[in-house]
Amino acid sequence: MCIRDSSITEEAIEDNLYDRLASRYTKALARSMAQTKQIKAASILNNAFSTSNPVGDGAALCSSAHPSLSGNQRNLLTTAADLNETSLEQMLIDIASFTDERGLKVAVRGTKLIIPKELQFIAERVLNSNLRPGTADNDANAMKSMGMIPEGAVVNHFLTDTDAFFIKTDAPNGFKMFNRSPIKLSLIHI
């Protein structure tokens, strides 16, 4: 992570403006650090479909060909689709069909829908309307009544694809974030 350094002029120090300027610069650096962390974290999802950024098995994060001992496994829809009732239901069905490397079913389920800001209103209708969204049917909204996505939808403002959406599951070893080396701050007195 690279954060441009800031400096305070000798005149500012001589005129006793150091405290006020240092406080402003410190806040700007803190914002910059927080922004950089968010951008880096979102880059995993922003590049999820790119084979230029493979994960441990050599495939894109979202792929129809994750190699395993039991054959290729997929974690994306067979046919790409926009966020709607049908595509979300199919993703939840696919998640319930996940198997491990030996072909045994694993008990995972979707817990949270991760979306860009452009999909927040569609997600609200799909997840939280009492009746099926976008139809004249009076059927109950099955995803809502069954509690299929208990943590609801969360908007990630750093996602760059306006129609990509992701489901976080309750798999025990999902995404992890850690600071390999913490930010180092130093003050040089002249």
List each model region and its residues.
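Short acidic, glycine/tyrosine-flanked loop/strand segments centered on an H-E-D-like triad
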Residues: 4-15
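Alpha-helical scaffold segments that mediate packing/assembly in large oligomeric complexes
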Residues: 13-24, 31-97
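Sequence/fold signature of self-assembling virion shell proteins
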Residues: 60-100, 107-112, 117-188
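Conserved small/polar residues in nucleotide/adenosyl-binding loops
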Residues: 1-5, 188-190
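Residue-level detector of short, conserved catalytic/binding motifs and their immediate flanks
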Residues: 4, 27, 111
